Curated annotation (Swiss-Prot):
Zn(2+) binds at residues 140, 147, 182. PROSITE patterns: INTEIN_N_TER. Keywords: Autocatalytic cleavage, Calcium, Cell membrane, Developmental protein, Endoplasmic reticulum, Golgi apparatus, Hydrolase, Lipoprotein, Membrane, Metal-binding, Palmitate, Protease, Secreted, Signal, Transferase, Zinc. Residues 1-22 form the signal peptide. This is Desert hedgehog protein A. One of its GO terms (molecular function) is peptidase activity. CDD domains: Hint (cd00081). The lineage of its organism: Eukaryota, Metazoa, Chordata, Craniata, Vertebrata. The gene is dhh-a. It comes from Xenopus laevis.
Length: 396
């Protein structure tokens, strides 16, 4: 039996390297996914998200200054990216020091800047600070904040630079000064960084029988409702749980839609299908990007979903996280059409990456952990580790 398992696993891994057309989700549940998101520059003094920097919905609270001699100094890593210009006024290399998360985001932004303006590079004017030039709780003291410009110092570009920083995954972006853009990130050890994409156990799904059931009671093999590419209701089988932990406390984004009796709770890096004022259709979008006025797709009654405007977005903590995966990669949670996936802002890519698990669902009993075990599924953990190095510019 062990030999059989090894062979099966080898075949599954090999399939990831083969472009199998039938493994993809086709056009997806909401039409074609190839729209390019229109990038809208930030206005002077605008910040995204529209909450204070040190709140849960943004970069989170300060954890205290980091000094060269402190134990936490090892949390800072140097950034020698040749595509970034560091001003380094102090001539100490301090501006190159930052947290791992900040480094990932600024490296992603550097690529976006060169793609947007050929011949122009990203310029960091202020990074980690050890001289006390900022407010006492500034994230600059922790290597979690940067002040940035473009290498040509063209202030007409700064609004778009701020937008690119938002797209690169910075947790808070502020067009703070006409001389620079301020960006910051969550702490590397924060719950918002480490947690996967999930729903609370109290979230309700509609079963194929028509009854409603909380996710905490959902079982592998159950049939739930989702939609096809036209928005018509269809049923889909629950294949496994990508993440299941009834004891874990997580911060959820609470989304309330106009005329919809239920409220959706979802972790910040889970994918929802959203139409914003700057997009041409419904696109897979991280939950933390959702804003009032965006459109979601909801089910009220009848045989299909309808568009509804988001009227409220807030944060709420609950205990219990659940992430079921269906054969279609989508499902209705509390009446809102959602993706089963998180972490990478591409529903199609996530769906294709998990194709081996869907193809081999008939022999699931021969693979490890394809049951109701708690925690993150082993296959997803491997993909997440690989994605950190291959697709880091699209990850929260």
């Amino acid at each position: 039996m062990p030999a059989v398992r090894i062979v099966i696993l080898a075949i599954c891994c090999g399939l990831l390297l083969v472009p199998v057309r039938c493994c993809g989700p086709g056009r997806g549940p909401v039409g074609r996914r190839r729209y390019m998101r229109k990038l809208v520059p930030l206005h002077y003094k605008q910040f995204v998200p529209n909450v204070p920097e040190k709140t849960l919905g943004a970069s989170g609270k300060s954890e205290g200054k980091i000094h060269r001699g402190s134990e936490r100094f090892i949390e800072l890593v140097p950034n020698y990216n040749p595509d970034i210009i560091f001003k380094d006024e102090e001539k100490t290399g301090a501006d190159r020091l930052m947290t791992e998360r900040c480094k990932d985001r600024v490296n992603a932004l550097a690529i976006s800047v060169m793609n947007m303006w050929p011949g122009v590079k990203l310029r960091v004017t202020e990074g980690w600070d050890e001289d006390g030039h900022h407010a006492h709780d500034s994230l600059h003291y922790e290597g979690r904040a940067l002040d940035i410009t473009t290498s040509d110092r063209d202030r007409n570009k700064y609004g778009m630079l701020a937008r690119l920083a938002v797209e690169a995954g910075f947790d808070w972006v502020y067009y703070e000064s006409k001389a620079h853009i301020h960006v910051s990130v969550k702490a590397d050890n924060s719950l918002g960084v480490r947690s996967g994409g999930c729903f609370p156990g109290t979230a309700m799904v509609m079963m194929g029988t028509g009854e409603r059931k909380p996710l905490s009671e959902l079982k592998i093999g159950d049939t739930v409702y989702t939609t096809d590419e036209t928005g018509q209701l269809i049923t889909s089988v629950v294949l496994l749980f990508l993440h299941r932990n009834p004891y874990k406390t997580a911060t959820f984004v609470l989304i309330e839609a106009e005329g919809h009796p239920s409220k959706l709770l979802v972790t910040p890096n889970h994918l929802l299908f959203i139409q914003s004022s700057s997009s041409a259709g419904f696109l897979p979008t991280f939950a933390y990007r959702v804003q009032i006025g965006d459109l979601v797709q909801i089910y009220v009654n009848g045989t299909q979903v309808q568009s509804s405007k988001v009227v409220r977005v807030s944060l709420e903590e609950q205990t219990g996280v659940y992430a079921p995966m269906t054969e279609h990669g989508t499902l209705l949670v509390d009446g809102v059409l959602t993706s089963c996936y998180a972490t990478v802002e591409s529903h199609t890519l996530a769906h294709v990456s998990l194709a081996p698990l869907r193809l081999f669902q008939g022999i699931a009993s021969m693979l490890p952990d394809l049951d109701m075990s708690d925690g993150v599924h082993w296959y997803c953990h491997i993909l997440y580790v690989l994605a950190k190095y291959v697709l880091w510019w699209d990850m929260p």
